[in-house]
Amino acid sequence: GPQWVFGLRPFAFDGSGRVVAIARSRGRDRLLVIEAGIEPREIPIEATDLSYVSVVGSVAVVLAAGPTRPTAVVRADLATGVVERVREARSLGVDPAYLSVPRFVEFPTAGGRTAFAFHYPPTNPDVVAPPGDLPPLVVISHGGPTAHTNRRLDLEIQAFTSRGFAVVDVDYGGSTG
């Protein structure tokens, strides 16, 4: 995110010359350990969106989220790569069968550029659309110009998809996504 948004912590220093940073590519965040002269090393975290990195010694703590699980505090041991989900923000109480998992989409735009989006298909195990029917589509665009969309659990999107709507969340050009 942009540096003029207060409180963002996309990177932290570990005190021994390493930087632990969030890198975003193709709509997914990764946690990287960066050292001078060495290829960056990824700490694999089961999430699509990461934020607010803190490091003490060889332990990093980050907020991690995905499309079907609430945001959680995650602890990562930088030496061993062991990752532990410490606590989720809330209990969801929804059967995952009703949660739509987004698909990353790329499409061409003006000037030979590429734009990105997340497509959330309708998801409800109790309903089957008639053959040949296409669902109504809701298109969402984030507030910009330096914001981006994400794949964090969004109950508003899930409300649409569980009721038979498809949703496309566009990450338009010029944004940080």
Please describe what each predicted stretch is.
Residues 8, 16, 134-135:
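Phosphate-coordination loops involved in phosphoryl transfer and adenosine-cofactor binding
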Residues 5-12, 153:
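Beta-propeller blade termini and top-face loops
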Residues 1-6, 22-31, 47, 64-72, ...:
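A flexible loop/linker signature enriched in serine peptidases of the S9 family
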Residues 32-35, 77:
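Structural recognition of the beta-propeller blade-terminating site
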Residues 51-177:
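Serine-hydrolase catalytic core recognition
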Residues 16, 25-28, 37, 70, ...:
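Surface-exposed loop/turn positions within WD40 beta-propeller blades
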Residues 1, 39-44:
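A short beta-strand motif characteristic of beta-propeller blades
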Residues 13-16, 55-57:
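Residue-level detector of Asp-centered blade-edge/turn motifs that repeat once per structural unit
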